[in-house]
A protein has these predicted regions:
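Short, surface-exposed glycine/acidic/tryptophan-bearing loops
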Residues: 52-71, 126-128
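Glycine-rich, acidic and aromatic/proline-enriched surface loops and short helix-turn segments
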Residues: 46-52, 111-114
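Residue-level detector of well-ordered alpha-helical segments, enriched
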Residues: 36-41, 55-58, 101, 105, ...
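N-terminal carbohydrate-binding/catalytic regions of secreted carbohydrate-active enzymes
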Residues: 22-44
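Non-catalytic cell-wall polysaccharide-engagement segments
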Residues: 1-4, 12-18, 32, 68-85, ...
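An acidic intrinsically disordered interaction segment
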Residues: 10-13, 43-50
């Protein structure tokens, strides 16, 4: 599965506050046998916390991936350990389900790995409308939102897509698109517009029963 990770995958637009974690990320990815995941982990750190461990010690928001309450993890090292473990598991699940789309795998970091199984069993390919559907019909109802209720979400990608909304208790179906601002996993050449600091960090909000 890791062969689908092109060696040319690069990060972009990352501030020093995120890059300061690069050596720790490289060490942990190497320890878990997945050095290819370093760019993705750094991009996820940017989206989840901006690398600001002073305000968000769980810089990868990894607590939920273990079935714990948000921010249970109190230090960046543990956050990276569990975050890499979760992402590695997503790549393993993708392989089992015949999925090679990196966007789908990155989206599953937010939705939970059940998203990959859902894509496979429903013969669907990840896209923003498909992620929208999963958020509305699977994630949100599992957390009590059975009416499709939406909440305002000011991220520029969301504003461009639907005026700036996502589903209450539905995770963040824009997640993969947001990470793409910081990781060229679609073969881009970089130069994207950085997400403004503080606008819509995409916190994962699913229970691990979902992952």
């Amino acid at each position: 599965m890791m062969s689908l990770l092109a060696a040319s995958v690069k990060t972009k637009n990352l501030p020093q506050q995120v890059l300061r974690w690069q050596s720790m990320v490289e060490s942990e990815c190497s320890a878990q046998g997945v050095p290819e995941l370093v760019p993705y982990v750094l991009g996820i750190i940017m989206v989840e916390s901006g690398g600001n461990s002073e305000t968000t010690p769980d810089i990868m928001q990894s607590s939920e991936s273990q079935g714990w309450a948000m921010n249970t993890i109190k230090n960046p090292k543990d956050s990276i350990y569990y975050g890499v473990k979760h992402l590695k598991g997503a790549f393993d699940d993708a392989k089992k389900n015949g999925i090679t789309d990196l966007s789908a795998i990155v989206q599953s970091y937010n939705f939970g790995r059940a998203y990959l199984r859902w894509l496979a069993s429903n013969n669907k390919q990840h896209s923003l409308p498909v992620a929208d559907l999963y958020s509305k019909t699977v994630v949100a109802p599992s957390l009590g939102n059975t009416t499709g209720a939406m909440v305002k979400y000011s991220n520029p990608i969301a504003v461009a897509y639907n005026g700036g909304y996502r589903y209450k208790n539905g995770g963040n179906f824009f997640y993969s698109e947001i990470v793409k601002q910081y990781v060229d996993f679609d073969g881009g050449t970089g130069g994207g517009v950085p997400q403004p600091e503080g606008i819509g960090f995409a916190k994962s909000k699913y229970p691990e029963g979902f992952g």
